[in-house]
Regions:
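Amphipathic, non-transmembrane alpha-helical stretches in extra-cytosolic proteins
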Residues: 24-116
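Bacterial Sec-dependent N-terminal signal peptides
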Residues: 1-26
Length: 116
C-alpha cells in the first residue's frame, strides 16, 4: 500500500515545488489538489506559497483515512488575482489553481475545476 501512494505523492511534491520555483522568473504556478494529499502536505504547500507572498487559506478540509476528500479554499496572489473554490476531491476532477505570469497568457488565472 505504501508503495502505491508514495509515487503519486512524490510526483505531486516535485510538480508543485517545481512550479513554485518558477516564481522568481514569474512564469507559472499550478497546484492540483488530489486524494493522496494529507493535512501535512497542505500545510507545507500553504507555507511555501506564503514565503512567496501568496496567501492560501483553507476554509474547510475533510479527510478520509488521512487523505484529502473535500476542500474549500481561497487563494490571493496579491496582484489583483484571487479566487475561491470548494469541491469534493475525486480522481475524475482536477481542483486547484493556476497563475500564469506570462504577458501573452491566454488565461492568466484559473481557480476551481481545471479540466476545461
Amino acid at each position: 500500500m505504501k508503495k502505491n501512494t508514495l509515487f503519486p505523492l512524490l510526483f505531486l511534491t516535485v510538480f508543485v515545488f517545481g512550479m513554485l520555483s518558477f516564481t522568481s522568473n514569474k512564469k507559472v504556478i499550478a497546484v492540483v489538489f488530489n486524494k493522496e494529499m494529507t493535512r501535512q502536505d497542505l500545510m507545507s504547500l500553504q507555507k511555501n506559497l506564503k514565503d512567496k507572498n501568496i496567501i492560501l487559506v483553507f476554509n474547510k478540509m475533510k479527510f478520509t483515512k488521512n487523505r484529502l476528500s473535500y476542500i474549500d479554499f481561497s487563494i490571493d496572489f496579491g496582484d489583483g488575482f484571487s479566487g475561491t473554490s470548494k469541491s469534493e476531491i475525486s480522481k475524475s476532477k482536477e481542483i486547484g489553481f493556476i497563475r500564469d505570469y506570462n504577458d501573452n497568457a491566454e488565461q492568466p488565472f484559473i481557480v476551481g475545476d481545471l479540466k476545461w
